[in-house]
Design a protein with these regions (language model features):
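Positively charged
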Residues: 1-175
Length: 175
């Protein structure tokens, strides 16, 4: 599924203040906006570094942690589920264009890492941000969302997803 860097665990960033790292972060933010994405991981631009950028686009707010629509940068992020509850989330990916699939994700996660200034950041999020963080950190671990799917019947083309991949239809068919 694409460039080999997407399937390889990314390397930790040692010097966040390195001009090359700062330039990479700027380029990632620009690429995320150009592609109208909610997040981007460095391996998606063929750089094996543990860096993600993400945001909550308008219309995707699900809970209070989603209210802040500013771009966030996490360097060397670590995620931990804050419980065992999961939910199916419909995901797409800039690295797998044209497809969408229902992926089980933890409903809430703790995160920690560093911002672009090198300051330690940590918190707990749910809703859309929890989903995006799990998706992007998976990229840093060499995991693409279809690899997390438990039922490959729940993946399809963007053009068909609206009609044939609705959660109410899927859950009804499984009952």
């Amino acid at each position: 599924m694409g460039h080999p860097v997407l399937l390889t665990p990314a390397q930790s960033v040692d010097a966040i203040d390195d001009p090359a790292v700062q330039s990479l972060i700027d380029d990632m933010i620009e690429t995320m906006f150009d592609a109208a994405g909610a997040g981007l991981a460095a391996p998606q631009v063929h750089v094996s570094k543990r860096i993600i950028v993400y945001r909550t686009p308008p219309g995707r707010v699900e809970e209070e942690s989603d209210q802040d629509d500013s771009v966030k940068v996490l360097v060397n992020p670590v995620l931990k589920p804050s419980g065992v509850e999961t939910t199916l989330r419909l995901e797409g990916c800039l690295s797998i264009p044209g497809l969408r699939g229902w992926v089980p994700r933890y409903t809430r996660v703790f995160y920690e890492g560093y911002d672009r200034r090198g300051d330690r950041v940590a918190g707990e999020v749910g809703g859309f941000q929890a989903n995006v963080l799990q998706h992007e950190v998976d990229h840093l671990d060499g995991v693409l969302y279809p690899m997390r799917m438990t039922d490959l019947r729940l993946i399809g083309f963007d053009t068909e997803a609206e009609r044939h991949l609705r959660l109410d239809q899927i859950q009804g068919a499984r009952s």
